[in-house]
Amino acid sequence: MAELAHQQSKRKRELDAEEAEASSTEGEEAGVGNGTSAPVRLPFSGFRVKKVLRESARDKIIFLHGKVNEASGDGDGEDAVVILEKTPFQVDQVAQLLKGSPELQLQFSNDVYSTYHLFPPRQLSDVKTTVVYPATEKHLQKYLRQDLHLVRETGSDYRNVTLPHLESQSLSIQWVYNILDKKAEADRIVFENPDPSDGFVLIPDLKWNQQQLDDLYLIAICHRRGIKSLRDLTAEHLPLLRNILREGQEAILRRYQVAADRLRVYLHYLPSYYHLHVHFTALGFEAPGAGVERAHLLAEVIDNLEQDPEHYQRRTLTFALRADDPLLALLQEAQRS
């Protein structure tokens, strides 16, 4: 169970420094971690806060670095990251709450306006908790707030700088293969096209609790291995991309009654992990990583490849990198020379 919780934390997609990542946000047991399992305990004992890595009053989220499993309290324990996030409201439960007599404390009153602190019952007071344990220095840096810098990556930059840098990193995506091979999260799969070349699985993103549709968020993960990102796509991949767009939209309509014109379907560049995947989010949801500097609408990707099969090998792409990302310095140096 501890291993499962650790692996799922690694893939929290878009809690990655935006994105898993994300993710974001890998498992060895199918059917665990989907909100239906029995109550469990955290996979460690104790949690001594060492540092607040990041917090956002707007997003109601905080990232904490702590020491756990300490024997003496002298720093001999292990590192862990705990992410606490207030969950979205569920309209039906809130309506029931307001019909009753909720516990209130008056904070302010003036004419027709008044402000209270309301203390909700247990079913409305849950806090989504993501655990990264044991946490490495890379995890700590990933969640630490950093300044961002825009870079423009040419096709040559990708081939000569970005790709060699990625290939030099130990970026495990075993958790992706576990999903595709049904070794983990098999009961969470909403739809599958099993074709090994042009098929995919559609699965709810871990950032979505599946309790309401306002923040609907699913991920399509292609079965075909070796496609790292947008940069690898050519006309050869058009059947796969068309399948993901059409069949993904149809599956979401069947399961959640959300029509295609109410969905935002896009790829990230840079992605939070390097196995081709596509994001499906509710159009009105301000999903992490949906900004113009990172999101590429799938329909437009298809159009671009239809007109120029090597569009993404040639095109200059703009994206943001954290100040501490080694790739930023590599690209800046290459562009100066």
UniProtKB/Swiss-Prot annotation:
It is found in: Cytoplasm; Nucleus. Keywords: Acetylation, Cytoplasm, Hydrolase, mRNA processing, mRNA splicing, Nucleus, Phosphoprotein. A motif (nuclear localization signal (NLS)) lies at residues 10-13. Its main location: cytoplasm. The hydrolytic product 7-methylguanosine diphosphate (m7GDP) efficiently inhibits the decapping scavenger activity and acts as a competitive inhibitor in vitro. Inhibited by 2,4-diaminoquinazoline. Substrate binds at residues 175, 185, 205, 207, 268-279. The modification N6-acetyllysine is found at K138, K142. InterPro entries: DcpS/DCS2, Histidine_triad_CS, HIT-like_sf, Scavenger_mRNA_decap_enz_N. It holds the Pfam family DcpS. Residues 1-37 are annotated as: Disordered. It catalyses: a 5'-end (N(7)-methyl 5'-triphosphoguanosine)-ribonucleoside in mRNA + H2O = N(7)-methyl-GMP + a 5'-end diphospho-ribonucleoside in mRNA + 2 H(+). A motif (nuclear export sequence (NES)) lies at residues 142-154. The C-terminal histidine triad (HIT) motif and the N-terminal domain are required for the decapping activity. The N-terminus is necessary but not sufficient for binding cap structures. This is m7GpppX diphosphatase. It comes from Bos taurus.
